[in-house]
Curated annotation (Swiss-Prot):
Keywords: Ribonucleoprotein, Ribosomal protein. SUPFAM superfamilies: Ribosomal protein S2. GO terms for molecular function: structural constituent of ribosome. The gene is rpsB. It comes from the Bacteria. Pfam families: Ribosomal_S2. PROSITE patterns: RIBOSOMAL_S2_1 (PS00962). It comes from Prochlorococcus marinus (strain SARG / CCMP1375 / SS120). HAMAP family: Ribosomal_uS2_B. GO terms for cellular component: cytosolic small ribosomal subunit. Transmembrane segments: none annotated. This is Small ribosomal subunit protein uS2.
Length: 238
């Protein structure tokens, strides 16, 4: 059975690419045509890629691989956090901080600092500090929660990075490739398919398209880990 149907992708707007002048010629193999100056993605090929991505991700999860979801643009942020949490993956959905992968030792220390501050807050230790000091600590806590909250469960580097917008997340792509971490990547018509191991050509700007793809990837991870793809926690985004 197909992982995703053509009607589901059409309804989600997964076929809409970027303006033709903004395309990457390497994506030509996944483009069906151009209409009114906009490239239309070939959803038959997207369906094939989704099947491949599902099987690849499921097998990776079955073998114990750890996943990191990355998508920091506004329309993807909530979906990234939701679907990563549903399948037990780590995530970055606000801003990619330089060195998140390539300077992992330093990043791990900052995550540990976040955990320490959370313990201090929950125990009342921060409230017992002088007002000014408590304010500084809470500001630090809020900032770390915003940018590193999705990484608290990540004990070491991920084995796979799942990416929403390749062009926006250039630094994440470069760091993953430098460390030979495979990328499962949504690819709009302005992307480079040569920069990922598992391509999924589709609209990476529409919330419903992002939800459809990440939802299936989360299903694959759950199936690989637990033998079933729990879809109960899925949400719909307008």
């Amino acid at each position: 059975m197909a992982v995703v149907t053509l009607s589901e992708m059409m309804e989600a707007g997964a076929h809409f690419g970027h303006q033709t002048r903004r395309w990457n010629p390497k994506m030509s193999r996944y483009i069906y045509c151009a209409r009114n100056g906009v490239h239309i993605i070939d959803l038959v090929k997207t369906a094939v890629c989704m099947n491949n991505a599902y099987k690849w991700t499921r097998n990776a999860a079955k073998s114990g691989k750890r996943f990191l979801f990355v998508g920091t643009k506004k329309q993807a942020s909530e979906v990234v956090a939701q679907e990563a949490a549903r399948c037990g993956a780590s995530y970055v959905n606000q801003r990619w901080l330089g060195g998140m992968l390539t300077n992992w030792t330093t990043m791990k220390a900052r995550i540990d600092r976040l955990k320490d501050l959370e313990r201090m807050e929950s125990s009342g230790a921060i409230a017992m500090r002088p007002k000014k000091e408590a304010s500084v600590l809470r500001h630090e806590l809020e900032r770390l929660q915003k940018y590193l909250g999705g990484l608290k469960g990540m004990k070491r580097l991920p084995d796979v990075v799942v990416l929403v917008d390749q062009r926006r997340e250039t630094n994440a792509v470069l760091e993953a490739r430098k460390l030979d971490i495979p990328l499962v990547s949504m690819l709009d018509t302005n992307c480079d398919p040569d920069l990922c191991e598992v391509p999924i050509p589709c609209n990476d700007d529409a919330v419903r398209s992002v939800q459809l793809v990440l939802g299936r990837i989360a299903d694959a991870i759950n199936e690989g880990r637990h033998g079933s793809n729990d879809q109960r926690a899925r949400q719909k985004y307008s």
